[in-house]
């Protein structure tokens, strides 16, 4: 019975909405994960034990539906067998209603939900936006068959962009490469309101906020990933911009201030 309840709790589909003037953000919960501390890079045994005494960490896979300047945008698509389509339906949006998907990068837990159980486009009317460097890395260099198959379902509807581009009204792409070669974050602006959608700039806030130099084994370039994290977090602290992170504890929002060599929430 206890095992059943645990599975049930991990399978709950929940969402949360927040408004910041002209930006309405809905957090879409896809999956929970509990990796062990062996995936941390740059943290010694004492640090791991201090923040995770039982050796286990708690993580989320999230996506975000954002309404800005009259447009609804889905940021990332979750896992291939996840709950993003269900979450959207709970919020009054059918998969066919999604017209715009912006991807922070092409790891499975961010692009996988682009396809349904039959391998077809889960969002049949959507255009998919991905950075040029990210697409080149996974499609041209790595020739990842799963990425290729997913993007093929959106043939003619995959748009590439460069960091610094205004991808659409109120949305600018920022270079946060390191986790992957083409990883981007997005700076959203509507009037005086701002939001940063940061993808995998952080995975485990319990340790990576006080110790931002800690990376994860999934970072293609750990040193560059750390630099990107510090640069964007410093910017967010200075400008007091909230951040939406795909692996931040639900509902995935961070408001940070500097704390010594690291950061803390306020």
Regions found by a protein language model. Give the residues of each.
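Boundary at the C-terminal end of the N-terminal hydrophobic targeting segment
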Residues: 18-20
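Active-site metal-binding motif and surrounding structural segment of the metallo-beta-lactamase
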Residues: 82-129
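Bacterial N-terminal signal peptides
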Residues: 7-15
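Metallo-beta-lactamase
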Residues: 89, 97, 124-175, 180-256, ...
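Active-site metal-binding loops of divalent metal-dependent hydrolases
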Residues: 29-31, 77-79, 106, 133-134, ...
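Conserved beta-strand hairpin/beta-sheet module of binuclear metal-dependent hydrolase folds
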Residues: 27-90, 185-201
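Residue-level marker for buried hydrophobic side chains located in beta-strands
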Residues: 73-75, 102, 128, 195-197, ...
């Amino acid at each position: 019975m206890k095992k059943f309840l645990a599975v049930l709790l991990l399978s709950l589909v929940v969402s949360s909405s927040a408004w910041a003037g002209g930006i309405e953000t809905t957090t879409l919960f896809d999956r929970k994960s509990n990796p062990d501390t062996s995936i941390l890079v740059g943290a010694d045994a004492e640090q791991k034990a201090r923040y995770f005494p039982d050796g286990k960490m708690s993580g989320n896979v999230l996506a975000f539906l954002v309404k800005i300047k009259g447009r609804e945008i889905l940021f990332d698509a979750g896992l291939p067998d996840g709950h993003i389509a269900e979450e959207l339906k709970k919020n009054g949006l059918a998969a066919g209603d999604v017209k715009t998907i912006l991807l922070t990068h092409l790891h499975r837990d961010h692009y996988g939900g682009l396809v349904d159980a039959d391998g077809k486009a889960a969002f049949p009317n959507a255009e998919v936006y991905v950075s040029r460097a990210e697409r080149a890395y996974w499609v041209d260099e790595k020739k990842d068959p799963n990425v290729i198959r997913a993007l093929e379902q959106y043939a003619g509807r995959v748009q590439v962009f460069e960091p610094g581009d205004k991808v659409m009204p109120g949305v600018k792409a920022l270079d946060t490469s390191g986790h992957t070669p083409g990883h981007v974050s997005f700076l959203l602006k509507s009037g005086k309101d701002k939001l940063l959608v940061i993808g995998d700039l952080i995975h485990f806030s319990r340790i990576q906020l006080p110790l931002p130099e800690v990376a994860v084994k999934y970072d293609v370039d750990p040193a560059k990933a750390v630099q990107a994290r510090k640069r964007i977090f410093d910017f967010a602290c200075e400008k007091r911009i909230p951040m939406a992170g795909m692996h931040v504890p639900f509902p995935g929002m961070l408001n940070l201030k500097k704390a010594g060599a690291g950061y803390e929430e306020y």
